[in-house]
Amino acid sequence: MNILIAIIILLVYTIVIIKIEGSIPPSLSASVFNIPTNKRWIWTVILFAVCFLCVPTYIEKTSENTQFLAFLAISGLAFVGAAPLVKFSDDEMQFTVHKVGAIVCAACSQILLVFNCPWLLLLWIPFIIYGFIKDFKAWRTIVFWGEMVCFTSTFVYCLI
């Protein structure tokens, strides 16, 4: 049930952001930087809710040897959520914390699947095929769709 609530929360946020921006953003996680500074807390609440709703199931379903990857993936997502609220003297540093958290989250979640449910990595096939058709370099929303594959594969893993 917690996973379904997390999916709904993230889905609603994604739909709202697409409506606000008028198109699919280059990255869901970077869309927070298009939100007015005084409202970025919404992003933090959403991602923390997703983290806290997913963590029990995610860690419980994962083999003991790879539970640290689930923890790192959730921690990375929490960093992505918290980065907009951290006051740095330099906006670039804030974005760097955001990017590192996103990379840790994505990498750990997918490495976890390699060891626990490798068939879910097949979800990357349509992404890769479309990328070659569309040309990865010219594909403005490549990160967005990569994030969607990571979230989808992780949510499906938690649901099965």
Where are these regions (language model features)?
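Membrane-proximal helix-loop-helix units in multi-pass membrane proteins
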Residues: Q67-W124
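Alpha-helical transmembrane segments of polytopic membrane proteins
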Residues: I35-A49, H98-A106, L120-W124, I142-F151
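Juxtamembrane loop-transmembrane helix junctions in multi-pass integral membrane proteins
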Residues: S31-F33, E64, S89-V97, D135-I142
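Juxtamembrane "helix-exit" motif on the non-cytosolic side of transmembrane helices
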Residues: T57-T62, A82-D90, F115, G131-A138, ...
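Terminal transmembrane helical module of multi-pass membrane proteins
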Residues: N116-I160
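N-terminal topogenic module of multi-pass integral membrane proteins
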Residues: M1-S63
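Hydrophobic alpha-helical segments of membrane proteins, primarily the transmembrane helices
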Residues: L4, E64-I74, M148
